[in-house]
Amino acid sequence: MFRARPVRVVMAATPLRGWQVDPATIRYVGEGLERPECILAEPDGTLWSADGRGGVVRIAPDGRQELILQSTVARNENSSFEDRYVNTMGSLPNGLAFDADGNFLIANFGTDSLELMTRDGRTRTLVDSIEGKPVGKANFVTRDSAGRLWLTVTTRMIPWTRHVETMSHDGYIAVIDERGVRIVADGLCGTNELRFDPAERFLYVAETTKRRVSRFEVLPGGALGPRETYGPENIGGFCDGIAFDAHGNLWSTLIMADRLVAVTPEGELLTLLDDGRPEATAALDAAWREERVTPDIMAQATGTIAPWMASLTFGGPDLKTVYLGSLRGSRIPWFRSPVAGLPLIYWNERRRAAA
């Protein structure tokens, strides 16, 4: 196990040790959502959810919601499980981030591109090829304090589930800045969400299919140092979403096992919520160990709170409300945490914009 150098903001023993989410306290927001994989929370209580119909859903603090479709795509509805989750047909907004003006950066798992969408749906493609090759399965995007964009690509395999079956190491991280777009880390296995520590000294990424979190030192000019494992070599499931809290704990959703865990700064793995089906999860784990995972085995493993639990977002005025994103859910579960989340770069930008 890698013993991480501290990323704590608050120098104190983690309140997460000995704490778990009480399922009876979980509440829900939104209804009729499609593939709410990623959620953005604003300081005023507004939520934005990626939506598999090809856009985002705005959920106002009073619960009213509005679907905003991308101007460049046809409405993506009524598709089969195989078309939506295996063949990823149509627009499938996956990872979301705000740009400096409050518009949406979209890593689109369906169109295999990085897109920019305004709040009224006008959309343009920012990146659809890198070094003369198609991007592949664009998964997540984030922004740093220098204005650079960081994009993860899970795999270049079509359909993407072939990557899970073969555990191919063809995922990568790309950076976009004034010099253009370039790959800064490759040979990764199921590259998914990525986050910075508070000082932006290290970049952390979920390697979903490898079932580990990796990190890279951020070097001058946007280069990355060598990969190193953060926390357990096997985090216990397919880590998908990751987010830091203010105590330096790195939370992660384990999709299909539908488990929420956290890695402490000391490298200890804590289970915060377990909503999976034990037998189906065990079958999936065995298939992963034997490199025989199939879409059918994956489909059987799921929970009920946030089916195919894919991400987590800290929100609320004190950043102690946790929202869970999912691939197969139609609403957003939320609960209260004993610790606040680490504010993302856009948090204070949106607070100033609302003032």
Regions found by a protein language model. Name each.
Residues 216-223, 265-270, 275-277, 336-345:
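Short loop/turn segments immediately following beta-strands, especially the blade-tip
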Residues 25-56, 330-331:
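Beta-strand-rich domains and repeat architectures in extracellular enzymes and scaffolds
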Residues 50, 107, 152, 206, ...:
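Residue-level marker for isolated small/hydroxyl-bearing positions within beta-strands
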